[in-house]
């Protein structure tokens, strides 16, 4: 995409606007300067960038740049990095979804200070009005009489009433704005699973009071193909996390998805369905599914995979995970893991003789896939190796290079850009894969890693305690 490969960490907080912090380390030729610019992902505004903000190079590490910017509206955005260095000028764009997710209460100390300042302003306004009514037309040195004092009192009362009404109306206006903001806060679409035998049907939709049943289904044409499929579905047996399936339900015409499930141990499964909407906005829809005992299963699809690690109650999994065919996935596990810290987590696939696997193949166009799942169910992330790109990033790259994205027009299903836009190079793949990730909170996590050799998709499982 660019002359330099760039690793980026972004943290944001939604409070009506989004403040993003960026830490960038280019992995190419030395960089002298770097700027960052927020732009809408699509539309006319994406063609007219604002003035860029300069990023600051570290005094101790000139290759490390840091900066921040505000995104002032919700939607699908791109953050563009423009670089100048030994290799010339270059740029990279990163898709960033910006949505309000919460309402935050004002801190009491701030509220008290603002209330005090407001009272001061009101009293000052009333005092000025009273002084004007009492003394504005007096000759210098004259003393106001009783009539002027009474008039000043009347004017002061009217001024105070005016301020009180203005404050009341302002409060009403603010409450309406807050209610509108709350109504527009981002909420993931709802995933509704239904199991008939081993036939799984999935519908994605949103509450809609205008719809006949109060619920409106999402059209499949509103979704983008990402890594060869419209939907990536993880099914993890709960609460022991001792069975995991990475499936890819096929679209059912205009709405919904379906899949003939493989043989699955009975129990309750947490479902995590990754989809990307046409505006570039990714979502992970969640639901639960109960699989009955004795369910007849179909063979796994060519792109599907599964694993049966030991249950959480059996103890923590180590840094090496033995696979059924004798291969092993080994994690270069850091000595300590802390929350909100960026890591580049490396995993190695070894053959039965303990040597690096020599027949590596891309899995869904990637060198590997990872799922980081917190054992209390509060966090899930499906990630890809360092240097890979999601569909919104591929769209940005093709637009910047003048390439057309088939399927971005019309109903969007036929010929949509898929693996051809992001296939790995024909060079031999390394048996070592690194996943950039930062654990969002302290606690216990189970990590599922998938790599492919020959025609076999391997799934390893690992446990992590994050401080």
Name each model-derived stretch.
Residues 1-138, 143-160, 166-467:
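N-terminal soluble domains immediately following signal/targeting peptides that reside
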């Amino acid at each position: 995409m660019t002359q330099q490969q760039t690793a980026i960490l972004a943290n944001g907080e939604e409070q009506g606007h989004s403040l993003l912090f960026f830490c960038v380390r280019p992995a190419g030729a030395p960089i002298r300067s770097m700027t960052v610019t927020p732009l809408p992902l699509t539309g006319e505004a994406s063609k007219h960038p604002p003035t860029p903000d300069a990023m600051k190079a570290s005094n101790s590490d000139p290759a490390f740049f840091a900066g921040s910017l505000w995104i002032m509206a919700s939607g699908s955005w791109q953050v563009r990095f423009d670089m100048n260095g030994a290799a010339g000028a270059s740029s990279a764009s990163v898709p960033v979804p910006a949505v309000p997710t919460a309402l935050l209460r004002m801190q009491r100390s701030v509220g008290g200070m603002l209330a005090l300042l407001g009272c001061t302003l009101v009293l000052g306004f009333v005092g000025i009005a009273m002084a004007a009514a009492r003394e504005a037309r007096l000759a210098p040195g004259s003393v106001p009489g009783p009539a002027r004092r009474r008039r000043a009192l009347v004017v002061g009362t009217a001024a105070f009433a005016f301020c009180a009404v203005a404050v009341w109306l302002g409060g009403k206006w603010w409450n309406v704005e807050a209610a509108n903001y709350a109504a527009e806060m981002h909420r993931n679409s709802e995933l509704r699973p239904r199991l008939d035998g081993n036939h799984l049907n999935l519908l994605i939709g949103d509450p809609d009071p205008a719809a006949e049943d109060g619920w409106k289904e999402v059209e499949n044409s509103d979704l983008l193909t990402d890594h060869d499929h419209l939907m990536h579905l993880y099914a993890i047996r709960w609460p022991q996390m001792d069975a995991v399936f990475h499936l890819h339900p096929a679209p059912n015409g205009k709405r919904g998805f379906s899949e003939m499930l493989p043989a699955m141990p009975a129990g309750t499964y947490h479902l995590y369905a990754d989809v990307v909407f046409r505006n570039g906005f990714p979502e992970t829809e969640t639901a639960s599914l109960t699989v009955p005992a004795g369910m007849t299963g179909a063979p796994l699809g060519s792109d599907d995979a599964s694993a049966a690690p030991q249950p959480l109650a059996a103890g923590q999994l180590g840094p090496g995970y033995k696979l059924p065919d004798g291969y092993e996935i080994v994690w270069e596990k850091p000595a300590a893991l802390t929350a909100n810290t960026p890591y580049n987590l490396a995993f190695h696939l070894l053959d039965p003789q303990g040597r690096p696997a020599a027949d590596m193949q891309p899995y869904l166009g990637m060198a590997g896939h990872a799922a980081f799942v917190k054992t209390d169910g509060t966090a899930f992330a499906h990630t890809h190796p360092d240097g890979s790109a999601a569909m919104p990033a591929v769209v940005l790259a093709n637009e910047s290079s003048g390439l057309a994205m088939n399927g971005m027009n019309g109903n969007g299903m036929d010929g949509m850009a898929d693996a051809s836009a992001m296939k790995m190079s024909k060079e031999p793949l390394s048996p070592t894969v690194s996943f950039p990730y930062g654990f969002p909170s302290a606690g216990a996590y189970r990590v599922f890693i998938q790599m492919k050799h020959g025609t076999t998709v391997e799934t390893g499982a690992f446990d992590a305690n994050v401080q």
